[in-house]
Amino acid sequence: MARYNAEASKNENKGWISMNQIEKLLAIGACTLWASSAAVHAAAGDDGIARFRATYKELVETNTSLSVGDCTLAAQRMAAHLKQAGYPDEDVRIFVPDGHPKEGGLIAVLHGTDPKLKAILMLAHVDVVEAKREDWTRDPFTLIEEDGYFYGRGTSDMKAQAAIWVDNMVRFREEGFKPKRSIKLALTCGEETNSALNGAGWLAEHERAAIDAQFALTEGVDGDLDAQGHRIALEILAAEKISQNFVFEVTNAGGHSSRPVPDNAIYHLVRAVDRVSQYEFPVQLNDANRAYFTGMAKIVGGEKGAAMTAVLANPSDGAAVATLDKNVDWHAMLRTTCVATMLSAGHATNALPQRASANINCRIFPGVPREEVLTQLSKIAADPAVKVSIPEVRGPIAPPAPLTPQILKPIETVAHQLWPGVPVVPALEPGASDAQFLNPAGIPTYGVTGIFTDPDGGHIHGLNERVRVQSVYEGRTFLYRLVKMYANQ
């Protein structure tokens, strides 16, 4: 997701990289214009673009939503590309957790030459958020290229990167590439739905050896574009929030709708949910958002840059916080956030409701216990009739992976090759990724895509999801070079 929403601001509508390193990164400049797509592809030899696009199209057009989709089918289709490239059966494996026939995934490996070096893991989820055809302008499960964009569910989150990982494996095999480290690929299901079986978590628990690696690469943050399409910065995931659902529930005896009473379950619930909408959790700073705002202050400049600097000096500076809060991404990076996402109430149109409930999805700031948020939500509800609970806990809480020079330097190197002058900036991701399962399992996991996105974030999880065609092709070049560099460290 793009962090710097220049248009929205204008209209007012993990160990860590040090501050000295940030200064060096930003010394090379604030932003650059788009280079020509042809130039970047020429630099990469433009090998197999049509084949990659076909793989991407096949993946997008395989419905992998939880309700009616089939991740196992998507994994099988991607496995076919690897086998066609010459991978033996023992190096390409479909896994299907018991009781979840359509929630399977893929594990594959290109063996390295140095058995003393641990592997690098390329991780992607292939499941997508639900998409209703009647709500979309275009068919969400048809890859449509229009006006310089790819449209379709999963085009941005995250089938572009999943297709790039598959494409990398095919290219490496066909080139006869002999990496020092083994290169592993894992495509999983269940990342997008908290109540679903998570494939990455399942692998960490049941197939730990198969995905064992020195570190893993996955989604998390993208490159930032402004409203004019100028590159602002390439972000690296330095930390991420934890996604946790809470339930507000009210029950009572109900009754006949002709005899209304003040003690109405819906009224209790609506008032409590409204109080959630008005509450702001306090500003918190850690290494990740400090590094981000330190870097972005120099890029953004002006009133907003000054506000970033002021908040870093004093998180209680109300005026500075108010300035940053006008940008939805910056607002989310500064604190825990909670929002109502689903409502359910009543049992008949002519009866007083016996039950009313709401799902409150919170993105919890790193290091804050779930129980602390539960306690605060109970205080916010401020009504003994409203019971607040945690329906399920998804994944353990673990510290983020350290951004060591071994990880950071190759990213800087490849970014400079492709986009001279664009700074590399660590970021705190307000969302969550499968890193939440791999980091606790002892596999440091980093989010970097090389895909630059618009200020609207490409409408991920929303209607008419899209990503720039050029961004996808450049991300392909970036990740191809980056993985090769890591594999020979």
What are these regions (language model features)?
Residues 16-27:
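Bacterial N-terminal signal peptides that target proteins for export
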Residues 1-18:
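Short, Lys/Arg-enriched N-terminal segments with co-localized hydrophobic residues
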Residues 38-42:
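Sec/Tat signal peptide C-region and signal peptidase I cleavage site
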Residues 201-205, 258-282:
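A short core secondary-structure module
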Residues 149-150, 156-235:
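Acidic/histidine-rich catalytic neighborhood of metal-dependent amide-processing enzymes
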Residues 43-153, 172-181, 360:
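Acidic/His- and Gly-rich active-site-bordering loop/insert found
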Residues 115-117, 224-225, 284-350, 354-355, ...:
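An extended, acidic, His-containing surface patch that forms the Zn2+-binding/catalytic region
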Residues 27-37:
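Bacterial N-terminal signal peptides
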